[in-house]
């Protein structure tokens, strides 16, 4: 019984850590995109 609980706990920990990593990567991608957008907008402002 205890082994099953330990294995389940490990699986849950793995899934959670993977989700966290994916979430962080997605967030950083969004931030980079926003930053690039703001740069482009700044350049357009300078041109106009």
UniProtKB/Swiss-Prot annotation:
Residues spanning the membrane: 6-26
Membrane topology: Single-pass membrane protein
A GO CC term attached to the entry: membrane
Subcellular location, record wording: Host membrane
Source domain of life: Viruses
Main location: host cell
Keywords for this protein: Host membrane, Membrane, Transmembrane, Transmembrane helix
Annotated protein name in UniProt: Uncharacterized protein ORF7
Organism: Spiroplasma virus 4 (SpV4)
The organism's taxonomic lineage, starting at the top: Viruses, Monodnaviria, Sangervirae, Phixviricota, Malgrandaviricetes
């Amino acid at each position: 019984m205890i082994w099953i609980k330990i294995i389940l706990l490990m699986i849950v920990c793995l899934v959670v850590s993977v989700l966290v990593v994916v979430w962080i990567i997605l967030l950083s991608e969004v931030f980079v995109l926003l930053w690039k957008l703001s740069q482009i907008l700044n350049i357009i402002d300078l041109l106009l």
